[in-house]
Amino acid sequence: MLFRSEAVLRWLGDPRRLQRWARNELTPREVDALARAIRSTDEFTIADVALLDELSTLLGRAPVNEAKDDEFDWMEGLSDGVNEVLTTSERRARAAAAREADEPEEYAHVLVDEAQDLSPMQWRMVTRRGPQASWTIVGDPAQSSWPDPDEARAAMDSMLSHLQRHSFRLSTNYRNSAEIYAFAGEVIRRTLPDADLPNAVRSTGVDPEHRIVDDGKVAEAAGDAAVELLQLVEGTVGVIVPPKLRPVVDPVLAELGDPRVVAVSPLESKGLEYDAVVVVEPDRIVSDTLGGVRALYVVLTRATQRLITVNSTTNWLP
């Protein structure tokens, strides 16, 4: 009988089976929560890919039907009326090549960007693709969306401990104005006082602006801020909104009818930049987004020229 990794993972939806396999690794509450989550999930997400890959590795390749290897194929590869006879060894070689085509490749060089966001299981998955490869790893712990960055870093060190390492530090920030980055630095240093932050060398003379409004007027205020910024920059205006507020804020932005206004969630903003940014409800970003203050730090560093925050409280301000 053949087992697919997807089916094996779904077996864990049975709490009794999960409890037996987990032994002392999970508490009864964790067993119930995990089993319930698996049973209630119709489709796997990107977060499950590393688990499925691990299971595929443990299960191994499907066995080959050796009976067919002993047969001769007298009619394969007809050319100019000549019958090509495939020997058993040739057939096995072709079967092995076909199997290898379905296996993860091993790469000579592996490049990992946003390395701070990889989980321990994802590091295991990636290193299987290049156990003897050279690596380029780019990351910033201050921007990690993983709940425990130290755990993820330890996993990376464990997986790549056999490799010689050369570290380089990014010392200059060219993206953000000095005014914007100074404020973002204040925010992240409340959580990571030892954060290794680069120096922003470009000044605009414009400080970030923070607007406090009534709770029911946040969406309207976000739209007003976007309109103002459209008049001040030639490029794009990013409006970064907690996912739960998108149904309220998105219609307001749609009424503006300007394609330069782009609404994204905090996690969607990673790796992006805008000429100006409106940050909606920073407190909600901290409380609702994986990574908390680190996620807010990412959001605050998306703007190259101007930054406006719109919030109903001042709790988040440094």
Named regions from a protein language model:
Residues 1-109, 118-123:
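Conserved helicase NTPase catalytic core signature
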Residues 56, 60-63, 75, 79-85, ...:
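Conserved helicase motor core of SF1/SF2 NTP-dependent helicases
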